[in-house]
């Protein structure tokens, strides 16, 4: 039996090994993207001095709106519970566009721009730097990443069978990484012991990652949890920022900035009631992580373990600011919840900093497994 699995392990690893290394390494580089960006651009994400009270949220939105061209609108404002963090004002375009504003002075600190390094790592991780074909042709990069990830699952499972020790002594020895007995021994120990230590996390990351590659897999994966897949965005699995940006089409149609033709037709500012909504949601949710308010809707997210994209959603009257409805995360549809859980488990954020560090290390070890495997295989030829 082990002989068969050894052949499966080898002949799946040889053609897909380098792809697995690229996928794992690029994934590891993305784990702490936010922390790296905030460390390198602290002046963008944090205010210089915390004032006695922030400006009204509507005032902040109007200050940004006054600087925008007629084709771009303010879609929402995200306020963190940390008073030293700058507010994020989301824009209608381009996709995911936003600027950071000092909520105490109204100073526009700068525009959010994803660093080229992380953009490259993301595209490498998801699509091997390929792009979706405008004519709807085969998305080869996405397909290759998905296929390599699926093969990685079989490689990991076959690796368990090959490794499985017969005695306790063999088990103890196989879980040691010795560094003083030559390069070959080190590579062997790293491949065997490293693979076993990270096995569960690598399997979890691979199995959740496949849901973004193949629709048939996503459908089956959801059904395992008794959930039917739904079309559309992240629902309650989406972050507050994503949810806010989801309202950009409605915001754009209604003229999400004062001035221009909309102002001439209707003197009502879409930002008038935002401060009232913000204050009420803060009072209702004292343990909030961030609150995002946009036209007629708002989301509240929390700093809790588990689904890091969990959020309560509210609707309100844009003129009066009266809360007209609420859909709490605990009452949300299961498909929205599982989307957020898949993301949180895949990136390791579900358990806070500890699980993120473990996922980062596991991904790095996963990137090394094909390389050490190639080395050991070539030495045997």
Where are the regions a protein language model picked out?
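Conserved histidines in hydrophobic membrane contexts and catalytic metal-binding motifs
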Residues: 1-381
